[in-house]
Amino acid sequence: LDIPTNPMRIQDVDFGVDVETKEDGLHHMAYVGEHFLGRIVLSSEDIVARIEYFDPYGNLYQVSHYDSRGFETLKQWYSPDNQIEVEVWLDVNGKPVIEKTYTPTRSGRMETWKVHNRTFKSLDELRLYFYNQLNMEGDNMFLIDRTNVAEWQLLQLDKPAYVVFVLHNHQASDATNPDIELLNDNYEWSLFNMDNWDAIVSSTPQQTRDIKNRWGDHHKCFTVPVGVIPEIQFQVDPIPMSARKHHSMLATARVAPEKGMDKMIKALAIARKTIPDLTLDLYGYVDHGNDDLAMKRINEALKELDDPSAVTLHGHTKDVGPLHESHQVYLIFSQMEGFNIALMEGQSKGMVSITNDVSYGPNELVKDGLNGYIVGYEDVEAFAEKMVELFSDDEKLQTMSDNAYDLSNRYSEHEVWKAWEPIFADFEAWIEAKA
């Protein structure tokens, strides 16, 4: 749908009476005299995200949620004990589309969904109805990218459809052992039902081989990269290493233990003994889970540096493109990856890469010795050695940057579309066989 963008601002909010608002950070409290009427919650762009309504006794009774384009998307009604009783999702014109009711039971709360005057006892049932509606006419292909919202339903359709199971992460619980018994729990049900899918798609050739080795090559397995580099990127003039921040490295990822940023810092501490002006910029929101383990490890690693200011933690950013253009080397030291689009994007802008040998994306995206280096899975010393090797030889660094630009053609729109073509050909064969 082509929906006009008309964001709701605080001055557009109408409580039906004249109100006075008092600012409290991203919250604006609405009053009529001394009577508290409601709370307006803004996004970081000063757009209305939701409006909370309160009764004369200070009890929350309704919340209205708004899309960033300016229309209301969801209404919620609350019980006197501050529990959601009813939720209604709206279309762009404000018409109710889906209603969800919560009914207290002895064991908790029961959910009831209503759509098109039909009642469903669970979200799974509602999704099955939705997919059946999509599948009513013609021959259809469904791609499951999020298994928990579709895997069971797409095997229960009233009319056959061509169903593709898409793996966008590691299938096993251990990235170093694809045959380990314990599977990635996000995919477990789908993996136990491998014979029911018409096609299985993974993002790298190695993962496709591992899938066939474990579940049998009788399955129709295809390799399609997760990421695509827009054609316009290949028309941009390359940025030479000499025009970038000197001796600069970059990592953009969720700051979590499994991303190994502490190991990058430890490697940097070693490398700076040879090249003292090396720097590392880290971007990503901090995962404070597991008793803040990620930051504890990072803070310990920072103590190994001769100068802690060599590492800067910037927090999350939405605009990573300029960072890829201003830095020279991109770092990965992860425990598990499914592809790593950020690495692909950095390479498309000429960044040289250093990664540990982690499946599945980085050890496919990085061609060792051409556009970067791959070191052992846990080898911090080797990681540091490659930092020194790259930044000790400007000519090599530039050559690898040139290669990074060239090898990014593997993920152009044209090349990725070619990877999809065998799947569509198999879909056509499925249609003919069914006729």
Region roles according to the model:
Residues A256-K273:
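A conserved mid-protein helix/loop that constitutes part of the nucleotide-sugar donor-binding site
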Residues D368-G369, Y373-V380, V388-E395:
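Conserved acidic donor-binding segment of nucleotide-sugar-dependent glycosyltransferases
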Residues A382, E389, K396-R410, A419-P422:
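A short, well-ordered alpha-helix in the C-terminal region of glycosyltransferases
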